[in-house]
Amino acid sequence: MNILGIDDNENILKLLNTVITMKGHDFTQALNGKDGIKLIEEQNFDAILLDLAMPEFSGLDVIECLKKSNKLQEQKIILFTASSATDKEIDVLLQNDGIKSCIRKPVDINVLINKVEEVVKSS
């Protein structure tokens, strides 16, 4: 699997990189939404872990950008966030074709990896 992590927290990206590569998967990371969009345009990913709360260009901005370019439905996005978004707001986001799940931080890393593998296999 080729997984993209978009998160402004370098420590989280380092942890994800370590665990995901130990499981035998490829991991690419972006520290902000703009870099994440650029990577999505250049490569194909089996899954995208997307933080909602990032400065300057948030996860919501990433989702809107993908919607406008008609690329959202092609993605398998797992919202991975400590955002204060309500369950109702998350439910609205999950109605978008490319958004498959939401996991709130903090999370057991094994639960996260299992969710990523489940989302990838589900299509």
Question: Where do the PLM segments sit?
Answer:
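His-Asp phosphorelay/catalytic-motif detector in bacterial-type signaling
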Residues: 44-46, 70-78
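Short amphipathic alpha-helix used as the core "switch/output" element in two-component signaling
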Residues: 38, 60-73
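Helix N-cap/capping motif at the beta->alpha junctions
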Residues: 29-38, 59
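Receiver (REC) domain active-site loop signature in two-component systems and cognate sites
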Residues: 54
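Two-component/phosphorelay signaling modules centered on CheY-like receiver
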Residues: 10-28, 96-97
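Active-site residues of response regulator receiver
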Residues: 51
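Alpha4 helix (beta4-alpha4-beta5 surface) of REC/receiver domains from two-component response regulators
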Residues: 61, 84-101, 110, 114
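Hydrophobic/aromatic residues positioned on beta-strands within the core alpha/beta folds
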Residues: 80-82
